Amino acid sequence: MDTPFIYDKHVTGRYFIGRRSECMILGNLLKAGEHVSIYEPPKTGKMSLVHQTLFNLRNDGHQFIVAFVDMLNVRTLSEFLIKFGTSVMKSVASTPEEYDAMVRDYLDGTHFVFDRVRFATYEELVSLNWNPDMNDVRKMLELPVRIAQVKGLPYFVVLKEFQNLMNADEYD
């Protein structure tokens, strides 16, 4: 039986109905630089809300950078840091040379490297050459802030499936 409901695509533009007040509130919070967490049951339109809000902000002339970090199957701190860094860097760079320069410039003094083989094989822009320490965590989480300062634009990071962090051994 066919179902009229589509669950695997985000709804935006003229197809987006309802939740207008939530879009306005989320947009105002983002413009004010606030951190926002949206936690609802699966398939309730969270990502459609986020996409529509970003769409509205762009239509209103706001410039910003956004990275979507898909945390599905993230089970360790290392996996999180690699996915986070890869998504953040992909939002502002597009060539191996740019990725390599970003790791050198922004993640200096850490255990992160740009490994061309891992990039070609797994599309990972950052790799760890040792177990991550607190300096690695700090520098990686500061990466969007540092990029925003250099670019002079707000930077939004959307963590999809962030509850998976609770499954990491290092969560406690």
Give a label for each model feature.
Residues 1-36:
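A short, basic N-terminal segment
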Residues 32-35, 40-44, 48-166, 171:
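P-loop NTPase nucleotide-binding core
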